Amino acid sequence: MSDLRELYQTTILDHNRKPRNFCKPAGANREANGWNPLCGDKVTVYLTVDGDGVVEEVGFQGSGCAISTASASLMTQAVKGKTVDEILEIFDRFHQLVAGSDAGEADSGKLGKLSVFSGVHEYPMRVKCATLPWHTLRSAVRGEGEIAKTE
């Protein structure tokens, strides 16, 4: 088994079994819901954004497959302490990575632990699982009231 595939499996299993930030932060002032109608994954992302646009706290709740849960867990770790603009940039990089674009491959080093999702593009149905929490995060960051969907 390749090192990246082994890291992928280890990381996904760890974050699925023990998701980080699986909660609603007490002071959350933004939230959004996401739903994948094809597989039934559901997620709610909660943010506490300060007056300067920095995410002080982030959490999520919901139910979904291992990839969706692990993606949400790793996402919360990646965006805490970041500005809204930085989060939108990370969103774009992550989306390019899991969609298999050349730009995403080039940026994988900038994504840290999130780069374990680089092989997801080989499984198109799983791309939606990995990106659902991210689309939901983007809706929360932007303050959109719609349910984020992968379709």
What are these regions (language model features)?
Residues M1-A26, K82-E151:
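C-terminal binding/interaction regions
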Residues T69-A70, E89:
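Alpha-helical macromolecular-interaction surfaces
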Residues S71-T83:
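Alpha-helical support elements that line or immediately flank enzyme active sites
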Residues G62-T69:
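Short, thiol/selenol-centered motifs that function as redox-active sites or metal-ligating centers
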Residues K18, F22-G62:
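Structured beta-strand/loop patches that form or line metal/cofactor-binding pockets in enzymes
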Residues C39, C65, C129:
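Functionally engaged cysteine thiol sites
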